[in-house]
A protein has these predicted regions:
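Substrate-binding pocket helix/loop in short-chain dehydrogenase/reductase
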Residues: 207-208, 212-217, 339
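Active-site loop immediately N-terminal to the catalytic Tyr-X3-Lys motif
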Residues: 209, 262-268, 290, 346
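Active-site helix of classical SDR
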Residues: 231, 273, 281
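Alpha-helical segment proximal to the catalytic Tyr-Lys
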Residues: 236, 286-287
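Residue(s) in the substrate-gating loop at a strand-loop-helix junction
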Residues: 257
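A glycine/serine/threonine-rich, flexible loop-to-helix segment
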Residues: 304-342
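C-terminal substrate-recognition "lid" of short-chain dehydrogenase/reductases
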Residues: 347-374, 379
Length: 382
C-alpha cells in the first residue's frame, strides 16, 4: 500500500515546508515514475496519499503498522533489510496489480472523491441531503450539535460507502472556535475541503406581537451569524488549496430558503435572516472570486414531508396554524393543502432536489453570488 519508500520533509516554517515538499515530490516522481504514497513531515505528522478516502486510510494504517513493527524489532535483533528482489515486488508485479484492483475507483457518482462539510446533517433534511451526497461518491463530514444522533448517522452512511468515508464532528455553528476545529479535523481526515454547505438553521414563526426578542436573536444567530463564521474559517483552507492548483475551485454554499427571496407573513425572523444570508453570499462572492472560491445559495421551497414541517409539537404546520398564518385553517391538514396549492409542480422540495442543485453549483465554474431557487415553481426569478 505504501510502496517501497516515502518522503521525509523538515522545514523552518509553513512556507519552507511547502517549498521543500514540492521539490521532494517532483524529484521522487522523476526517479520512480509515480507519486509518493506517504509524506512524513517533521513536527506535523504523516500524510497518506491515496486514490480515494478509503485507500488513503489504508495507506496510513499500513505505514503506522510498519513503524510499530520496526520499533518492536529493536528488541529482537534489529531490522533485517529486504533484498532488492522483494523491494521490487512491492513496487511492481502481482502485489501492485492486486492493490490497484482493490483500490480501483467505482466511478459511480458526480461527487466522487469530493470532500463535503455539511452542518445540521444529523437528522431530517440534513441527513437526507448527506445520504444523497454519499450515494454520489462524496466524503462527508456530518457536523451537528446532536452527538448521539450524529454518530449514528455517520455509522449508517458509512455502511453504504464504497471508496468514500463519512465522519461525525460535534459542532456548534454559533461557536467560531468549534467551527475552526471542524475544518481542521476535516483537513486532517481527508486532506482538504472542496465544498462547505452551511445547512444548519432554525425557524420560529410569529408576528410582531408574538415574537420575543430572545427568540429573534436566536434565529438570527443560527441562520445569519453562523454563515459568516462558517465562511470565515473555511476560506483560508480553500485559498491555500487553489494556490497550488490552477484548475481547482472551492465552494461555499448556503442552504437558504424561498423566504430569502420574498417576504413571509408572521415569519419575519426567519425571512429576515435568510434575506441577510443572501447579502453575505453576494458580498463573499465578490471578495473570494479572485481566489476561485465560489459562494452561492440554494433557495429551496418547503420540505412539506420533513420533520421541520410535520413534527406534531414543534413543526411549522402546528406553528403556522397557531399563528393564524393560513386564513381559515382549522387543522394541520388545512395548512399543508394551502402550501401545496401554491406550488405549480404540486410537490414539496426533497433532499434529492437540493442535492442536484448543490452538485450543479459545484461542477459549474461560470457563476458565483447566485441564489438558485428549487421551489417547484412557487418562486420564479424576475
Amino acid at each position: 500500500y505504501c510502496r517501497a519508500s516515502y518522503i521525509y520533509v523538515a522545514g523552518e516554517n509553513e512556507e519552507d515546508i511547502l517549498a521543500k515538499a514540492e521539490e521532494a515530490i517532483e524529484s521522487y516522481v522523476s526517479v520512480r515514475g509515480y507519486t509518493p504514497k506517504v509524506l512524513a513531515i517533521k513536527g506535523v505528522g504523516i500524510l497518506a496519499v491515496g486514490d480515494n478516502a478509503k485507500n488513503a486510510s489504508e495507506i496510513a494504517e499500513a505505514f503506522v503498522n510498519a513503524l510499530n513493527t520496526a520499533l518492536e524489532s529493536e528488541s529482537a535483533g534489529g531490522l533485517q533489510p529486504m533484498p532488492q528482489s522483494q523491494i521490487d515486488s512491492v513496487d511492481g508485479g502481482e502485489a501492485k496489480e492486486y492493490q490497484l484492483k482493490v483500490n480501483a475507483s467505482t466511478g459511480y457518482g458526480r461527487a466522487e472523491n469530493k470532500v463535503f462539510i455539511v452542518t445540521g446533517a444529523a437528522q431530517g433534511f440534513g441527513e437526507g441531503f448527506a445520504r444523497c451526497l454519499v450515494k454520489q461518491g462524496a466524503n462527508v463530514v456530518v457536523a451537528d450539535l446532536n452527538e448521539t444522533t450524529g454518530m449514528q448517522t455517520a455509522a449508517n452512511l458509512n455502511s453504504i460507502c464504497t471508496t468514500n468515508r463519512v465522519i461525525f464532528f460535534k459542532t456548534d455553528v454559533t461557536d467560531i472556535a468549534c467551527l475552526s476545529e471542524l475544518v481542521k479535523t476535516t483537513v486532517c481526515e481527508f486532506g482538504g475541503v472542496d465544498v462547505f454547505v452551511s445547512n444548519a438553521g432554525v425557524a420560529i414563526a410569529g408576528d410582531l406581537t408574538q415574537m420575543l426578542p430572545e427568540k429573534f436573536e436566536f434565529v438570527t444567530k443560527i441562520n445569519y451569524n453562523a454563515f459568516f463564521y462558517c465562511a470565515k474559517v473555511v476560506t483560508p483552507v480553500m485559498k491555500l488549496q487553489n494556490k497550488y492548483d490552477e484548475e481547482l475551485f472551492g465552494d461555499i454554499i448556503q442552504i437558504n430558503s424561498k423566504s430569502g427571496l420574498e417576504g413571509s407573513k408572521a415569519n419575519f425572523a426567519y425571512a429576515g435572516s435568510k434575506f441577510g444570508g443572501l447579502g453575505l453570499v453576494q458580498s463573499f462572492a465578490l471578495e473570494l472570486a479572485p481566489y476561485r472560491v465560489k459562494v452561492n445559495a440554494i433557495c429551496p421551497g418547503n420540505f412539506l414531508d420533513g420533520p421541520l414541517w410535520s413534527d406534531p409539537v414543534k413543526g411549522l404546520y402546528v406553528q403556522y396554524l397557531n399563528a393564524g398564518k393560513v386564513p381559515g385553517a382549522k387543522i394541520v391538514e388545512d395548512v399543508r393543502e394551502y402550501y401545496l396549492s401554491k406550488v405549480p409542480m404540486h410537490k414539496g422540495c426533497t433532499p434529492e432536489d437540493v442535492t442536484k442543485g448543490v452538485i450543479y453549483l459545484m461542477e459549474q465554474t461560470g457563476e458565483t453570488g447566485q441564489a438558485l431557487p428549487i421551489t417547484g415553481g412557487q418562486v420564479m426569478l424576475k
